[in-house]
UniProtKB/Swiss-Prot annotation:
Gene Ontology BP annotations: cell division; flower development; fruit development; leaf development; protein deubiquitination; proteolysis; regulation of protein stability; root development
Spans annotated as Disordered: 301-378, 764-783
Compositionally biased tracts (Basic and acidic residues): 354-369
Residue intervals of the USP domain: 441-747
Provenance organism: Oryza sativa subsp. japonica
Protein family membership: Belongs to the peptidase C19 family.
EC number: 3.4.19.12
Miscellaneous information on this protein: The dominant gain-of-function large grain1-D (lg1-D) develops significantly enlarged grains.
Protein name in UniProt: Ubiquitin C-terminal hydrolase 15
Record GO cellular component, one term: nucleus
Binding-site residues for Zn(2+) 2, renumbered to this chain: 99, 102, 121, 125
Length: 975
């Protein structure tokens, strides 16, 4: 064996250790240098772009001179050349930037700016306000530099007293022009108005013959029949010396003149112009001349208030008050924002002022992007008080109208409503309407596929999903070229419309790989895992048309039909026991998995254990962000938003041991989730059982066994489905099974979170008609209930999917689908629900726990349906369940339950198949109404009259009709 020489060790050390370390260090330095250089180049490029943008839009301070208004021939001026070199105030080198505050000092770098600032510039630097003392001040950069072609002219100093006003975009103008007259020597104010009256670059001067000129400015030329040149706007024969124009022929003819001329204004009163307050100007034209007034003159301010007196002495039959309004924005300001009042004025002006004139087609896009409000035409009221009328109209324009607010709110709501993938109103119909012509069929076992058969049977009995599949709403918009799960489920649902033998789910099972599911292949699988894959795949199929889950925002994903049915939220609250800081987190769920070990004997016990506080200690300590350490904490889970289709999974399988918990866990067929919900707007979440999945085994193990399902069809009959075998069973048999998965359907669907947050969920018609104030008397409540029942045929309907049924459209429903019509049977006016016992307390109707009983004195403060009905001034039963179900009721077997309250006895009738409820204390035509009462203390019998010898301890009973005859489904009544 070769032995290494001693001289090789240092060489190996240098080669394999020292050199790699040195190379790593050098590469790191080189990488840092390259990154720094790239970062510097990026910053320099950004600074250069910003500087170029600032230089492009830089303007000097401009004070428009003089009080004379002379028209000049229309001409376009070439842009002035800007200086290419600027000197740094510190090092006198080429300057690239300037002071962002005063806009008057330039620098070559940020370092020079800091040095100059510390040398004393911070004492002399003043905020730039549009009329500063610097000659190099300007406007800040805006988002769109193409909207300001006039800035090139303003960068050059003024020569003489000519100021070019044509092609100016007054949307971005820093200070407006001053227009005065020589005859009055007026010191007028700028063309100003409220900020809500501006932003339009395409403005014009709208004048009427011998009338007013509504002053605005048009950037583009108009094609006008008989166009009048701009030099004739103010005729030379009509001087400005006469102030007593009669204006008898005001408003005879309207003409639009392009105001693209050059205005000469001697700067005689420039100092006073700066000191004048902002005011609106009225420009009008009469037979004697053209006049300009302002509210400053009418108020007696300034040395030229006598002009207002001469103006008041003029008698005329009418006038047009025009306001040449321009709003200037001082930097910084955003671009492209249009106020609400401006939009309303713009609509009015578009219909009045642009009527009969053809616009320049090249300006359509610009007019759409940036719009402004121009003052509207008004009727001629006389020349007296022109300035006062103008001032009042300016104030009126500042206040948006109520109609405008309403229209804007409606527009916003319409836009928000469009961001919903499946309308909530249609989901309400899927929950409310009755379904006919559908009956479950068996499924062939395609090799250990009982888990899939049981889950598919439960999903096909999910009412809203079943209606959605039968209406083929997905396939109408499906754009998938490959195999689609939703389209396949629609094909399977269509087979349920026809009577026959079992069908095969082989097409679904053979394509499980296409939906990312690793189940199948003939092996035994978990039904819960298959359900999760199926629900998530249906959610993905709903989003495929929009580009997939990654392309759709999270808030929009919650508005799909699958998410609205199965989606919910859990709330996790952790409280630090050291600093008592509380943190909350929310988690989206598709089902609710509950532990059943220990003392749990019912579903309510499992929910109580799930929502009980848990101490985090030992190895499970909580890391508090405020304490910055692992501390003891207390954690509590609660259901923040319960899904509309609540899937409860009882964890019977033990992980690691392959064992199964075969203990008996009772469950109700009407579940009250009020004690376990923290959401404020989620009351009362009442759920009805409609499907159960049971795992049957003989070896008490999780790796073997068989899945069967119990489902309630659309007519309310419970069926036991074992693959291809379907048989009717009683409710008692369903309640005695060891359930693995429970499917509950909400009594009324909860709206999505986006509806609740933005207040877009419209109250259904039935809820609006059913609501009443608690202050009304019993007679008013009764009349209100009668009107509700009388109109119920317009609120509820039936989806009839029988093969012989034709296409019927509903004129009152918003959803236009096939096989739909309103209920018109004998019991259409009744309000029904499916009641059952399923309770462990003799006084409870809605939960099996004594804590939720609403008839005992000790728990009266807890929530109950009767309390809810009392607070709303409604009947306790019909107020909760009335709006939810309206089914027809074929003749069947009824049992009555009579209770005696301190006032009068009432009798209730119950039928298992249809859930029909009636009250003998109410009129005969109101079978769905139940009188409100808190102290039921009589028994039930099989007749409408209370028996003489009734057990006073019996409270509630019901009998259903099966093939063998009467089957008692409640243990609280004795026959």
């Amino acid at each position: 064996m070769l032995q290494p020489r001693e001289s090789d060790v240092p060489v190996l050390f240098v080669v394999f250790i020292v050199l790699p370390v040195i190379a790593y260090f050098l590469l790191g330095r080189w990488h840092d240098a390259v990154s720094k250089k790239a970062r510097v180049s990026v910053l320099a490029q950004r600074a250069a772009e910003e500087t170029f943008k600032v230089e492009t839009m830089a303007t000097p301070d401009v004070i428009l001179p003089g009080p004379s208004l002379r028209p000049m021939p229309y001409m376009r001026s070439a842009p002035s050349a800007r200086p290419e070199y600027h000197e740094c105030a510190t090092c006198h080198g080429p300057a690239k930037t300037r002071c962002s505050r005063c806009k008057s000092v330039r620098y070559c770098s940020g370092k020079c700016q800091i040095i100059h600032w510390r040398q004393g510039h911070k004492q002399t630097c003043q905020q730039w306000n549009g009329f500063g003392t610097s000659s190099s001040g300007g406007l800040p950069p805006t988002e769109n530099t193409e909207q300001m072609p006039f800035l090139s002219n303003l960068n050059s100093p003024l020569r003489g007293s000519d100021v070019h006003l044509h092609d100016m975009d007054f949307d971005t103008m820093s200070e407006p022009s001053f227009v005065t007259t020589d005859s009055y020597n007026l010191d007028t104010s700028p063309f100003l108005s409220d900020r809500s009256n501006m932003n339009k670059p395409n403005q014009f001067l709208h004048t009427s013959e011998n009338g007013a000129a509504i002053g605005s400015y048009e950037k583009n030329d108009y094609s006008i029949d008989g166009e009048v040149p701009s030099s004739e706007i103010l005729s030379g024969n009509k001087g400005l010396n006469n102030s007593s124009g009669s204006g008898e022929n005001c408003g005879n003819r309207d003409v639009i003149y392009p105001l693209n001329s050059v205005v000469h204004q001697p700067n005689n009163y420039a100092p006073e112009i700066r000191k004048r307050p902002k005011a609106s100007i009225t420009v009008y034209e009469s037979d004697k001349g053209v006049y300009l007034t302002s509210d400053m003159i009418s108020s007696g301010e300034g040395p030229y208030a006598s002009a207002a007196e001469s103006l008041q002495r003029s008698n005329s039959s009418g006038n047009v008050t025009g306001k040449g309004n321009m709003i200037h924005k001082k930097p910084p300001y955003p671009s492209g924002k249009v106020s609400s009042s401006q939009k309303s004025q713009e609509k009015v002006l578009t219909s009045h002022q642009y009527d009969g004139h053809e616009k320049n087609p090249h300006n359509k896009n610009e007019q759409r992007s940036t719009k402004t409000a121009v003052s509207t035409n008004s009727s001629l009221q006389g020349c007296n008080g022109i300035s006062k009328a103008g001032a009042s109209k300016v104030e009126a324009l500042k206040k948006p109208s109520k109609f405008l607010k309403t229209s804007l709110v409606g527009l916003i709501n319409d836009n928000k409503r469009s961001k919903v993938l499946f309308p909530y109103e249609d989901l309400v119909k899927f929950f409310q309407y009755e379904v006919r012509g559908i009956s479950p069929r068996g499924l062939f076992n395609c090799g250990n596929s009982c888990y899939a058969n049981a889950v598919l049977q439960c999903l096909m009995c999910t009412k809203p999903l079943m209606i959605y599949l039968l209406l083929r709403l997905h396939s109408k918009d499906c754009c998938s070229k490959n195999w689609c799960l939703m389209c396949e489920l629609e094909q399977y649902a269509s087979t349920l419309r026809e009577s026959g033998g079992p069908v095969s789910p082989s097409r679904i099972l053979s394509n499980l790989r296409n939906i990312g599911c690793r189940l199948g292949g003939g092996s035994q699988e978990d039904a819960h895992e298959f359900l999760r894959h199926l629900v998530m795949s249906m959610q993905g199929a709903c989003l495929d048309g929009l580009g997939g889950e990654k392309q759709v925002e999270a808030s929009l994903q919650e508005t799909t039909l699958i998410q609205q049915m199965f989606g919910g939220r859990l709330k996790s609250k952790v409280k630090c026991l050291r600093c008592y800081h509380e943190s909350e987190r929310y988690e989206n769920i598709m089902d609710l998995t509950l532990e059943i070990h220990g003392w749990v004997e019912s579903l309510q016990d499992a929910l109580t254990q799930f929502t009980a506080p848990e101490d985090l200690d030992g190895e499970n300590m909580y890391k508090c962000g405020r304490c910055s350490a692992y501390v003891k904490a207390r954690k509590q889970l609660s259901v923040h938003e319960v899904p509309n289709i609540l899937t409860v999974v009882l964890k019977r399988f033990q992980t690691g041991k392959y064992g199964k918990i075969n203990k008996c866990v009772t469950f109700p067929d009407m579940l009250d989730m009020v004690p376990f919900v923290t959401g404020a707007g989620d009351n009362p979440p009442l759920y009805f059982l409609y499907a159960v999945v049971v795992h049957v085994d003989t070896e008490n193990a999780s790796f073997s066994g068989h899945y069967i399902s119990y489902v309630k069809d659309m007519q309310g009959t419970w069926l036991r489905i074992d693959d291809s075998e379907v048989q009717a069973v009683s409710l008692n048999q369903v309640m005695s099974e060891g359930a693995y998965m429970l499917f509950y359907m909400r009594s009324f669907p909860r709206p999505p979170k986006i509806y609740i947050e933005k207040g877009l969920s419209s109250v259904p018609t039935c809820s609006k008609r059913h609501s009443s104030k608690s202050s009304k008397g019993s007679k008013q409540d009764l009349n209100h209930t009668e009107s509700l029942f009388a109109s119920s045929d317009q609120t509820y309907g039936i989806y009839d999917f029988r093969p012989d049924n034709g296409y019927i459209q509903d004129q009152h429903a918003a959803l236009r689908t096939r096989n739909f019509y309103h209920t018109d049977d004998a019991f259409a006016d009744s309000i029904s629900t499916d009641f059952s016992d399923a309770t462990s307390s003799e006084w409870s109707l809605f939960t099996s726990s004594d804590e939720s009983s609403f008839t005992t004195e000790s728990t009266r403060d807890s929530f109950s349906v009767v309390d809810y009905g009392d607070n709303a001034g409604l009947d306790p039963i019909s107020s909760i369940f009335g709006p939810y179900y309206a089914q027809d009721h074929p003749p069947g077997s009824f049992a009555s339950c009579t209770r005696l309250s301190p006032s009068n006895p009432q009798t209730r009738y119950f039928q298992e198949n249809t859930g029909f409820v009636s009250d003998s204390s109410m009129p005969a035509h109101l079978p769905g109404n139940v009188h409100r009462g808190r102290y039921p203390d009589r028994a039930c019998s099989s007749s409408a009259e209370p028996p003489a010898s009734a057990n006073p301890r019996s409270v509630y009973g019901r009998y259903g009709l099966s093939r063998e005859g009467f089957v008692q489904t409640s243990g609280f009544c004795q026959m």
